[in-house]
Amino acid sequence: MAVLRHRQSVDAASAYTSYITPVRVAMRYLHWFQTDLRLDDNPTLSSTLSADSLLCVYLLPKPRPWCNLVGLGAQRDRFLRESLQELREQLQSLGQDLMVLEGSPELVLPAVIERFEIDHLVTESTPGWHESQALNHLRSKLEIPMTALPGNHLFQAAQFPFSLDEYPDTFSPFRRKVEALAITPTLPAPDALPPPPAA
């Protein structure tokens, strides 16, 4: 009798839950462009395609003359701005836009994340030690998940047949160990992107 009552309560519960539509939480992503200013072969941008909305951001470094960092030279600055304009036009053709801001990531990005109620930050990881430390510092300042994916590399670190401790000292031994490895296939530019979030 107890088993029958239990089965009836389970049937009633399953009949009740079949009328409930699961609630899906909207995900707002922020893609922070750094050095990879293209839509094609961009794994970090491709990882945002499932988001409900996407905010694309680029941060211009702020000149710091007091520590002898005066910013970019005139030619490099012009090249960067032309590249950003081209990226913006490509994004606009997909219903997106590029927000270009100035300042350090650990100060600017948390404010942007709060203003637009971002749920997830995506950016590229770079192999430099200082760059890795800067990403770790930024991650410690955020209250949301941050994903940093490798971009514009011929190989992924997991493909190498040696550890960092066994890294070849010169190029020829390195070349012999990696020349048989498959190069990571390129990714096409997305046909569509999630829309920007409402301000």
Regions found by a protein language model. Give the residues of each.
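Trp/Phe/Arg-rich N-terminal binding region typifying the photolyase-homology
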Residues: 20-186, 191
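N-terminal polybasic/positive-inside topogenic patches
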Residues: 7-20
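Short, intrinsically disordered, charge-balanced linker/junction segments flanking boundaries
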Residues: 190-199
